[in-house]
C-alpha cells in the first residue's frame, strides 16, 4: 500500500515537471506555430494593402471617366454640384457582394468566457448604427468637397485626415508612436501634398468656392479619422476581447463590420437622395451621359464595387495593424493614382512631373519606415519567446 502511494506521488511529480519543462518537440512546435502565425499575419497585411491600392486606383479612374462623360468639364453651374447624394450612396451600396464571402470564410468557435450575448448584441447594434451614420456623413461631405473646390485644394485639406487620426488614436486607442512611425507620417504628409492626381469633376478656376462649402472637406476628414479610430476600438474592445470570435483576429470580423456599417450608411444616403429630390435627376443624368445609358450604369456599378474593395482593405489594415497604418496606406495611393490618371487620360498640361516622382518615392519610403516598425515588433515577440524558452530550460 505504501509502495502504491509512493509510486503515485512519483508519477504526479513527474507529470508536474513535464508540464513545467516541456519536451523539445513541444517547444519546437510552439516556435513553429509562432512563425506560422507571423507569416499568415504578413500575408493578410499585404493582401489588405493591395486591396486599398487597387480600390483607390479604380475609384479615381472611374470617377474621372464618369465626370468626363457626364460633361462636368463644361462647367455648367446647373450640373456642377448635383449628384452628391448619389455618389455618397455609391460609396456604400455594394455591400451585398460581401455577404457570400462572410459565410464562406470560417468562423472560430466563440470562447466560453464570452460576456452576456444580449448585452453584446445591443452594443454591436449601437456601434454599427453610429459608424454607419458617421460613414454616410463622410461620404456626402467627401462628394461635396471634390466638386466645390479645385482637386489640389481638396487634396491639401483632406490630408488633414491623418492629423486628426493621430489625435483621435492617441486619445481613443492609446496608440504609441515610435521614431520610425513618426518618420513615416512626415514622409507621407509631404508626398500627399505634392502627388495628387487630376480630377475632371472640379470646377473651373473662376468657380472655386474657398468658403464654407470647400471647408466642409475638413469635416469629412474629421469624420473619416474618427470612424477609423472607432473601428479599431470596436475590434480591440468588443469583437476581440469579448471572445466572440475566439481569441483570434479573423478576416470575418472585417466583413461583418463592413456589411453592417455600409448597410446603415446606404439607408441614410438613400433617405437623403429622396428627401433632397435628387432622385428626379437620375434619368436626366443617364441620358446626358456621352457613352449612353449602358455605360452610365456600368460606371456606377464599377464605382460601387471599387469602393467596397477599398473599404475592405482599409478596415482589414485597421484590424491587423492600426488605424494610423491604414490611413498612411490610403494616402500612399495618391502618387500612384496620379500616375495612372496620366496614363489613362489626356488632360491638358497634366504629366507625371518631378514633384510627383518625388512624392511616389516618398510614399514608398513612408511604407518602408512603417514596415520596419512592424518587422521589429514581430522580431521582439520571437526574442521574448526564446527568452521564455531558455528560462524554462534553466
Swiss-Prot record:
One of its GO terms (cellular component) is membrane. Residues 1-20 have a biased composition (Basic and acidic residues). It is a multi-pass membrane protein. The keyword Lipid metabolism does not apply. It holds the Pfam family PUNUT. It is found in: Membrane. Keywords: Membrane, Phosphoprotein, Transmembrane, Transmembrane helix, Transport. PANTHER family: OS09G0467300 PROTEIN-RELATED, PURINE PERMEASE 17-RELATED. This is Probable purine permease 23. It comes from Arabidopsis thaliana. The gene is PUP23.
